[in-house]
Amino acid sequence: ISTEYEEYAEELTAKIPLLKPLTLKLSIMPSDVAAAIDLGSNSFHMIVARINDGQIQVLDRLREMVQLAIGLDGRNRLSEESQQRALDCLARFGQRLRHIPPTQLRIVGTNTLRMARNSAEFLARAEAVLGHSIEVISGPEEARLIYLGVMHSVAAIPGQRLVVDIGGGSTELIIGEQFEPLHLTSLKMGCVSISRACFDDGRITEARLHKAELIVQLRLEPIGEEYRDLGWQVVTGASGTIKAVQEVVVREGWSREGITLEALRRLRGALL
C-alpha cells in the first residue's frame, strides 16, 4: 500500500470532493472561499479553501481527535461526554466559519452518526453550535467522496487503483480508474470499533489479535472474490491509521516506502 501524501494530505481525502461540487452545484464565483467539515468517527476535520477556476487553494485546515465512536454504548447511544467533546470541537470550528455563507459550506457526518440511535438529538445541538445544517451521508457516498479526494491528491496512473480508507467506525474500499469509481464498498468496521471489541483495555495478546483478524476476515469475505476479479494496479491508503502504520514500518526498517505484507507480518510479531 502506498500513501502518496504530503504532511497533511490525508486530511484532504474526504474534503476536496466536498468542495468540488460547490463550484458546479452551488454556483460559487471562481475566486470565492468555501469550506467543508467531516465529522468522522475518530476525528473531525475542517478545510477552508479558495476555489479559483476549478482549482482548490487550501487556506486553512483543522483536525481534532474527538473519538466520537468511543461514546457509543451497548444500545448505540452517544454518551453525553462524547457529545460534549464533539460540540466543543465544533464551537472552535464555527469561529472559522463566521464569514462563510451556507451556500459555500458542506458539513457531513459518517458512520457513527449513521449508527447512533440519538443521532438526531446530537445533530440538533451540533447545528445550533455551528449555525449550519449537517448532512449524514451514506456509506457508499462516503466511499465515493474518499475516492475522488484521493484522485485529487495523487499522480495519475494507467489502469485501476484500489483505495483503502480505515476510519474510526467504517472501512471503505474503492476500485476505480482515473476519476471514475467503478466499485465501492463501505464496511462497518474501523480502528475504534475493532479496538473496543478486541483491545478495550489496551492489552494485545495472540488470542485477542486472532479475534480481531477473524472479525476483519469475516467482513471482507463477501466482497473478496468480486474485488479480486476486478483487479487493480496499485493500492493507495487514505487514512490516518494507514499513515501511522507506514510511519512505523519505515522507521523500523521493515519497508523502504509504503506498506508491504512482510512489513505487516513483522509489525504483528513486534506487537506480541
Predicted region positions:
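Generic start-of-chain signal for non-secretory N-termini
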Residues: 26-31
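A generic, well-ordered mixed alpha/beta core segment in the N-terminal half of proteins
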Residues: 162-170, 174
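Conserved Rossmann-like nucleotide-cofactor binding loop
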Residues: 42-44, 169
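Aromatic- and glycine-enriched glycan-recognition loops and surfaces
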Residues: 37
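Conserved ATP-binding subdomain of kinase catalytic cores across diverse folds
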Residues: 58-67
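Short, low-complexity, charge-dense intrinsically disordered segments
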Residues: 3-25
